[in-house]
Every structure is written in C-alpha cells, then in structure tokens.
Amino acid sequence: MELQRLALRQQRSVAVDYEYRAVPLFMQAERLLRSGAVGTPWLVKLDWLMSSRADASRGWSWYSDRKAGGGVIGALGTHAFDTLAWLIGPVGAVQALNSVSIPERPGPDGAMTAVDAEDVALIQTTLSWQGRSDCSVPAQVNLASVARNGRGCWLEVYGSKGTLILGSENQKDYVHGFSLWLASSGEPLRSIQADADLAFPTTWSDGRVAPVARIQGWWAESMRSGQPMIPGLMEGVASRLACDAAASN
C-alpha cells in the first residue's frame, strides 16, 4: 500500500508481471467470458499441478523457506489468484489446506535442512462475477509443485449457458502448450483459436519472453499516456492479500 501511495504521489507508473494476462489464449478466454459465452459462471476450478520440486534431492533454497517467500502459493498462487480475479472477478474469503510433502532438502553444506514452505495447497474461495456483490461464484484452486506427471495448468469454467476450458500439460514451459475449448449448453467442446489481433508478433523458445515483452509494451504506453498501468500495484496487492490468506491457514 505504501508503494501505491508513493507511486501516486510521484506520478510513476508501476507494472506487476502477471504475464498470463498477456498470453493470447488467456486474452481470448477473457474476451469470451466477458461476451457471455458461458453465461453466468456457476463453478470455477483451477488445477495447477507441476513437478518442478518433486525431486527430493533438489537442494534447499529460498523456495523452501516460507519467511523468504517460498512455497507453491507464492510461486503459482499469486498468478492463479490474479488470473481468476481478471477472468471472473474479485477474490473473496479464502480457505486452504496446505502441506509440505518433502520436509527436508540438502542444504549448501550437504546437511539436511528443514523445509517449511508448502508444496501442495488446496484452496477454496469465491469470486464476484464481474465485480457484482450479488453474484458469488464458488472456486476451487489446487496447486502443487511435487505432482509427478501432474496434469499441468487447467482452468475450467462451468456456467449457465456453457463451459470453457483452458489448459496445458506442458511441464517444461509455463506458457507454451495451452489450448482453449468452448461448449454451449448441450453441445460438445470445440477448439477455439485466439483472434488475430491477440497473436504475438514474435515468439521465442522460452514461452515467458513474449508475454513479458507485451506487458513491457503496455507499461511503456502507460508511461507515455499517463493512464494507470494494468496489471499494476492494485492488482498485485489484491493477489498478495489472497495469497497471505491462503498461506495463513
């Protein structure tokens, strides 16, 4: 909050790197949801099951230390909460069941060092559809960094008029590999491509580069125009508060 006040006082534009807002298929999903493609959401489910920390021989680091910001909530949860707030609406009360599956890892000196940062988090919350206080959508978020052969990142939105699914099984890249499907009531899922105006002009082997470059472009435009940067500190604070609530359970 102090950073927000400082930025406003000094008329500075501040960006937060929530790069999924800049990924074409995520932007397409947002466009579809806003247009009413699934009607009013009734249930939202997000599974983000990765294997990056499943090897118990992987060394202890800041990621293993809760006080240093480690854990799956800080790594994946911050993006998950922001994505849900952007696509559906503000995050409400949060309840979580957190677990440390690998309680020790080899430290720099070779000795086993205790791990207190969660590597599994099962989270329940509500989302205010398009910010409406009279339309609360139940949401389930499952995060893991120790899921061997995990299914990757999958978002499912079930609504009054249809279903939207956005997902990727890619365990090596957090951006490449996503696909999007949509089904109207009574119809099978069909694959959806991103609209041409959402495509990246250039892509790289590391999938993170293109969306980060797009975020930087938005940031530069914010500085030129004087308009607020989104995602910025306000979005960062909202996600951080949700993460703190989940981690405190």
Model-assigned labels for residue ranges:
Residues 10-15, 20-115:
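Predominantly a Rossmann-like dinucleotide-binding segment in NAD(P)-dependent oxidoreductases
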